[in-house]
Amino acid sequence: MLTVSGLVKSYGRRRVVDGVDFHVERGEIVGLLGPNGAGKTTTFRMTCGMVEPDAGRVLLGGQEVTSWPMYRRAREGGMGYLAQESSVFRKLSVQNNLLGVMELLGIGRKERRRRCDELLEQFGITKLRKSKAMSLSGGERRRLEIARCLVSEPDIILLDEPFTGIDPVTIDSIQEIIRGLRV
């Protein structure tokens, strides 16, 4: 499904990623572990197309995508990415965070409503649908971000530190949802 080989990235004379290799099959949950500053986020950003590697390759479904921009990896390659930084549209409601992305993807109005309701239910945020995203707790915000990442129905999702700043109970709940996505 996803093969990353020999990724290298330097900023000036500082090499932040040095020959990273990994392979992920459909249904697998794989983590990148290491101390702060080890290059995990840079590796994610190179893998999803936000940052161009100095060397190395990214294959998605057997296709070379190293030179593809992020949007193309998402649309044609089925890759979703959730950054560690907050990515909600703060002034939009929870439901409009989902509906807006679906509209950009060209999904029809009736299907947008159906999928929005489905995602709100799946992530336990239906009661928050009219709330502004800026008013959400850390766990609620993260649920919304993951739901929004799933709007495009990606084949693979890269989650960069998905549990930062979230309480243990919410972490368990989100982990359960993620495990349920493996089907």
Q: Which ranges hold each PLM region?
A:
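Helix-to-loop junction immediately C-terminal to a conserved catalytic motif
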Residues: 48
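ABC ATPase NBD coupling module
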Residues: 64-80, 85, 109-113
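Conserved ABC ATPase "signature" region
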Residues: 99, 110-128, 175-179
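Conserved ABC ATPase signature
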Residues: 132-136, 140
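Conserved catalytic motifs of ABC-family nucleotide-binding domains
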Residues: 153
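Catalytic Walker B motif of ABC-type/P-loop ATPase nucleotide-binding domains
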Residues: 157-160
